[in-house]
Amino acid sequence: MSEEEEDDPQQQAELTSKQKQDIAKWFLTNSPPGEIHCIAKDIRSILSDEDAYNAAVSEAYPLYNKSHMICLELPNRTGDVLITTFGEIDEIEYLDPRTCQVATVNHVKQVCTNVRPATDEELPTSFIEEFRGALDAELVKYVAETYPKGSCSVYCISGKDVEGPGANFELAAVISASRHSPQNFCNGSWRSIWNIEFKDDLQVVELRGKLQVDAHYFEEGNVQLDANHECKDNTIFQSPEDCAVSITSMICHQENEYMASLEASYTNLPDTTFKDLRRKLPVTRTLFPWHNTLQFSLTRDIAKELGI
């Protein structure tokens, strides 16, 4: 085969429908906060393959919605539901522990289409609910004070059948906040997941946190922030109300510390990281003598060599 034939796009094998689907799915699942609809629209026009597009969308949207922990309003306006793996009952049903309701979700449209009461099997015992409800109440107050457009939820992810003291159980507290301002060319989100283990045998409560911050600025450029942080803390096992106050205080402290560290690192970015990216000396290891550039007259050197 000639070189011309190798470079000819017509001679190159086209992507299969499955390959197109996988590529489209990757772009959709990696969309910046609040931008998946716009990216889906562009992908649809580029693919020109409706089957591959529909397959990619049906797989990518649920993953994106759970990863970004999007918040959807319940159809009866009794509250909101966070789309998380902790509240996932099946592919389209998600539990809202606060209202004891299960929402049916259309992932692609990102709306709740139906709601039903949660069954007893889907809810924790009254003993666990005391701890879950107390923490949820404290977390709601913290999120309202800290995040202008934030939502939170607390789930029992282990030991929901525990009837009383003497056994261990685990809660998961999630916080999701986002700000979408495409007219100002910026979108961002904050997500934090807190696994809280109540160890009755040790009379201790252990906290493990995973924090993620995403931001996208795209005015006359394309700048993205993707920052992650993990942390741990612990407190003593107390009453539901006292545990809730202590846990929320630890969450507040850890999140404020991380935000302060982010602000400090990016404030110093121009004077540290960006400066280090520049080559301190050219490849000749000699500074260019800008004060005496006449000695580098190209015209004069050429004339001398040619004897002009």
Model regions and ranges:
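Residue-level detector of alpha-helical secondary structure
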Residues: 40, 44, 132, 136, ...
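Terminal, non-globular segments
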Residues: 14, 18, 25-26, 31
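Amphipathic alpha-helical elements of HEAT/ARM-like alpha-solenoid repeat scaffolds that form extended
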Residues: 36-43, 75
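Long amphipathic alpha-helical scaffold segments
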Residues: 46-150
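Short amphipathic alpha-helical segments that mediate assembly, nucleic-acid/protein binding
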Residues: 19-24, 36, 53
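C-terminal/domain-edge helix-coil "capping" segments
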Residues: 4-10, 14, 38, 49, ...
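Surface-exposed short loop/turn segments
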Residues: 133, 137, 145, 150-224
